[in-house]
Amino acid sequence: MKNYKIIVFGTVQGVGFRYTTKAIADNMGIKGIVRNQSDGTVYIEAQGNSLLLSQFISSIKAPKNPFAKVTKIDVSEIPVKTYNDFSVTY
C-alpha cells in the first residue's frame, strides 16, 4: 500500500477536473482526497497499490474531460493514512 501526494498543473480548476478525478479513483478503488489550491493547481492524496496508482496517474494526465488540460504532474510518496473513500474536499 502506497500513498502519493500529487500536484496537478494546467487548466484544472473550474472545469470539473476534481469530479473527473473522483470518478477515476472510485472506478479504480483508489482512496484519498482531491481539492483546489489557491495557486490554481489541484492537490490529490491517492492511496492504493503501486500498479493501480500508476494507472491512476496515467488516467488523470489525460482526463476524459474536454475542458481540462494537464500540463504537469508532481508526485511524491507520503505516509499512509486511513481513508474511507475518495472525496472532493474544499
Curated annotation (Swiss-Prot):
Catalytic activity: an acyl phosphate + H2O = a carboxylate + phosphate + H(+)
Acylphosphatase-like domain location: 3-90
EC numbers on record: 3.6.1.7
Keyword field: Hydrolase
Active site residues of this protein: R18, N36
Hydrolase recorded as keyword: yes
UniProt entry tagged with the keyword Isomerase: no
Gene Ontology molecular function: acylphosphatase activity
Gene3D superfamilies according to UniProt: 3.30.70.100
Family: Belongs to the acylphosphatase family.
Protein name as catalogued: Acylphosphatase
Protein's organism: Ligilactobacillus salivarius (strain UCC118)
